[in-house]
Protein backbone atom coordinates (compact mmCIF):
# COMPACT_ATOMS: atom_id res chain seq x y z
CA UNK A 1 0.00 0.00 0.00
CA UNK A 2 1.99 2.90 -1.29
CA UNK A 3 1.63 6.03 0.79
CA UNK A 4 -0.25 4.38 3.66
CA UNK A 5 2.70 5.17 5.94
CA UNK A 6 1.50 8.76 6.23
CA UNK A 7 -2.27 8.32 6.32
CA UNK A 8 -4.15 9.36 9.46
CA UNK A 9 -7.11 7.01 9.11
CA UNK A 10 -10.38 7.36 10.95
CA UNK A 11 -12.38 4.35 12.11
CA UNK A 12 -14.79 4.70 9.18
CA UNK A 13 -11.91 4.72 6.70
CA UNK A 14 -10.47 1.53 8.18
CA UNK A 15 -13.88 -0.17 8.13
CA UNK A 16 -14.40 0.74 4.46
CA UNK A 17 -10.96 -0.62 3.54
CA UNK A 18 -11.56 -3.85 5.46
CA UNK A 19 -14.97 -4.28 3.85
CA UNK A 20 -13.49 -3.79 0.40
CA UNK A 21 -10.66 -6.20 1.18
CA UNK A 22 -13.08 -8.89 2.35
CA UNK A 23 -15.21 -8.44 -0.76
CA UNK A 24 -12.13 -8.83 -2.99
CA UNK A 25 -10.89 -11.90 -1.08
CA UNK A 26 -14.31 -13.55 -1.44
CA UNK A 27 -14.27 -12.76 -5.17
CA UNK A 28 -10.73 -14.20 -5.59
CA UNK A 29 -11.70 -17.38 -3.72
CA UNK A 30 -15.01 -17.74 -5.55
CA UNK A 31 -16.87 -17.83 -2.24
CA UNK A 32 -20.15 -16.02 -1.68
CA UNK A 33 -21.81 -15.00 1.57
CA UNK A 34 -24.22 -17.91 1.13
CA UNK A 35 -21.31 -20.35 1.57
CA UNK A 36 -21.06 -19.25 5.23
CA UNK A 37 -17.23 -19.04 5.35
CA UNK A 38 -15.70 -16.37 7.56
CA UNK A 39 -13.47 -13.72 6.08
CA UNK A 40 -10.71 -14.46 8.59
CA UNK A 41 -10.77 -18.10 7.53
CA UNK A 42 -10.36 -17.07 3.88
CA UNK A 43 -7.52 -14.67 4.74
CA UNK A 44 -5.71 -17.44 6.64
CA UNK A 45 -6.30 -19.89 3.80
CA UNK A 46 -4.73 -17.50 1.29
CA UNK A 47 -1.95 -16.40 3.65
CA UNK A 48 -2.94 -12.73 3.47
CA UNK A 49 -2.36 -10.30 6.32
CA UNK A 50 -5.36 -8.11 7.14
CA UNK A 51 -5.13 -4.71 5.45
CA UNK A 52 -5.42 -2.78 8.73
CA UNK A 53 -2.49 -4.77 10.15
CA UNK A 54 -0.46 -4.15 7.00
CA UNK A 55 -1.11 -0.40 7.20
CA UNK A 56 -0.16 -0.42 10.88
CA UNK A 57 3.14 -2.12 10.07
CA UNK A 58 3.88 0.40 7.30
CA UNK A 59 3.02 3.35 9.54
CA UNK A 60 5.20 2.12 12.40
CA UNK A 61 8.03 1.21 10.05
CA UNK A 62 8.03 4.75 8.65
CA UNK A 63 7.88 6.19 12.17
CA UNK A 64 10.94 4.15 13.17
CA UNK A 65 12.76 5.36 10.07
CA UNK A 66 11.91 9.00 10.89
CA UNK A 67 12.90 8.60 14.55
CA UNK A 68 16.33 7.26 13.60
CA UNK A 69 17.01 10.27 11.35
CA UNK A 70 19.23 13.06 12.65
CA UNK A 71 17.70 16.24 14.07
CA UNK A 72 19.10 18.23 11.13
CA UNK A 73 17.27 16.16 8.54
CA UNK A 74 14.31 17.82 6.79
CA UNK A 75 11.95 14.97 7.75
CA UNK A 76 12.64 15.57 11.45
CA UNK A 77 12.20 19.30 11.00
CA UNK A 78 8.82 18.81 9.33
CA UNK A 79 7.71 16.41 12.06
CA UNK A 80 8.56 18.91 14.79
CA UNK A 81 7.14 21.91 12.92
CA UNK A 82 4.76 24.09 14.92
CA UNK A 83 2.26 26.07 12.87
CA UNK A 84 1.38 29.44 14.31
CA UNK A 85 -1.94 31.21 14.01
CA UNK A 86 -5.52 30.76 15.09
CA UNK A 87 -7.10 27.39 14.67
CA UNK A 88 -10.56 26.94 13.21
CA UNK A 89 -13.74 26.28 15.12
CA UNK A 90 -14.60 22.68 15.94
CA UNK A 91 -12.64 19.54 16.45
CA UNK A 92 -9.23 19.39 14.83
CA UNK A 93 -8.28 16.81 12.24
CA UNK A 94 -6.82 13.53 13.35
CA UNK A 95 -3.05 13.75 13.35
CA UNK A 96 -0.67 11.13 12.03
CA UNK A 97 1.21 10.96 15.32
CA UNK A 98 -2.04 10.17 17.16
CA UNK A 99 -2.40 7.08 14.95
CA UNK A 100 1.21 6.11 15.61
CA UNK A 101 0.79 6.62 19.38
CA UNK A 102 -2.31 4.38 19.38
CA UNK A 103 -0.46 1.72 17.36
CA UNK A 104 2.52 1.82 19.73
CA UNK A 105 0.22 1.55 22.75
CA UNK A 106 -1.61 -1.44 21.23
CA UNK A 107 1.67 -3.25 20.50
CA UNK A 108 3.37 -2.30 23.77
CA UNK A 109 6.13 -0.30 22.07
CA UNK A 110 7.80 2.86 23.32
CA UNK A 111 9.18 5.74 21.32
CA UNK A 112 12.74 4.92 22.42
CA UNK A 113 12.43 1.38 21.01
CA UNK A 114 12.66 2.85 17.51
CA UNK A 115 16.38 3.54 18.00
CA UNK A 116 17.09 -0.21 18.15
CA UNK A 117 16.08 -1.52 14.74
CA UNK A 118 15.89 -5.18 15.83
CA UNK A 119 13.61 -4.45 18.79
CA UNK A 120 11.44 -2.12 16.70
CA UNK A 121 11.06 -4.57 13.80
CA UNK A 122 10.36 -7.43 16.19
CA UNK A 123 7.65 -5.41 17.90
CA UNK A 124 6.04 -4.42 14.61
CA UNK A 125 6.05 -7.92 13.14
CA UNK A 126 4.74 -9.46 16.33
CA UNK A 127 7.79 -11.55 17.18
CA UNK A 128 7.12 -10.86 20.81
CA UNK A 129 3.84 -11.22 22.71
CA UNK A 130 1.74 -8.07 22.58
CA UNK A 131 -1.74 -6.94 23.51
CA UNK A 132 -2.74 -6.64 19.84
CA UNK A 133 -1.89 -10.31 19.19
CA UNK A 134 -4.21 -11.37 21.99
CA UNK A 135 -7.01 -9.26 20.50
CA UNK A 136 -6.45 -10.87 17.10
CA UNK A 137 -6.66 -14.35 18.60
CA UNK A 138 -9.94 -13.41 20.29
CA UNK A 139 -11.37 -12.22 16.96
CA UNK A 140 -10.40 -15.49 15.24
CA UNK A 141 -12.28 -17.59 17.83
CA UNK A 142 -15.59 -15.83 17.21
Q: For each of these PLM feature ranges, what is it?
A:
Residues 1-142:
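Short linear motifs embedded in intrinsically disordered, charge-biased segments
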Amino acid sequence: MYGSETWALKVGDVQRMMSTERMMVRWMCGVSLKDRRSSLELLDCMGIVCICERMRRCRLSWFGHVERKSCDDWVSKCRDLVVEGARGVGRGRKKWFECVANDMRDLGLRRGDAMDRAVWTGGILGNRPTRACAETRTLKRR
